[in-house]
């Protein structure tokens, strides 16, 4: 039986014809005789990308909820989807924020306090919004999303919660599969166990490509770097990593590499450490990110990103509302396309 499609996808299928499973393939999946890769698979029901059919790519992933199915999105509106998922009892993740920020064009967009504040406020307000994608597909439009993640960690952790970094192949086509994914550490593969793993951050995010960390021409192949053990030594004030398929380990805090090697001495590195540290393992197969380890010396305090008056904020909200109208956004997209084509022509002339 062919799946029910909402009208927008029905139109898109005219442009790009879908490839259906044959009756034999579908039957083999149902009776368990389909080709076996030797690994199990967990079907996470009720997962969907929300706030779609928008030009601005303000997408949110909803998990363990039916909220958002068939709903037409609103331009530049992350919070509406996050709120809807929260009220339905599900979990959410902010998708490819760099695609919305266009930080792949200008990395400074990932450092702008207004942009950081927007996502930080959502994360503080909705605990069910677990974090952002640190990797998406082949890391083109999301190459600065680790930079934004570090900014958010510094802004949000002092408020009392962590921000998980996710990875997603966003597989619209077969070639996207295995480009970005998460490596979970779980006692079993039940739906509820996966949910707890997402909530607790018991997973590592892997990317086959990482433009800033590995170079724009690098493509990971073969076995990817993985973490097999993490040891936090309270007496030594150190964290050590064990793993496989890597040739370098880097430690990051406040968006900067502060140490290298399988072990970090937190006291020796204290001058460069903020409220967290995270590790990344690099190898021939790509890059593997740990979640952030929160470091609290007792002096942690809430972060205020911008000091603006209520009147300034009111004006800003009115401007943002206007910039989220379809009329404005359509004009913006046309201008961006013209600028993009101009850049391409200039690059070809060089």
Q: Model-found features: residue ranges?
A:
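A metal-dependent hydrolase metal-coordination microenvironment
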Residues: 1-109, 127, 133-149, 166-172, ...
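C-terminal functional module detector
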Residues: 2, 156-165, 169-348
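Cysteine protease catalytic core and zymogen-processing segment of caspase-like enzymes
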Residues: 22, 112-121
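Short, flexible, glycine/charge-rich loop motifs used to bind or transfer phosphoryl groups or to couple energy/partner
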Residues: 33-35, 119-123, 154-156
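Flexible, charged surface loops at secondary-structure boundaries
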Residues: 85-87, 123-128, 270-273
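Short, surface-exposed, charged loop/turn segments at secondary-structure junctions
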Residues: 104-115, 177-187
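Catalytic pocket-lining loop regions of alpha/beta-barrel enzymes
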Residues: 119, 124-133, 212-217
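Surface-exposed substrate-engagement region within the catalytic domains
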Residues: 120, 147-155, 184
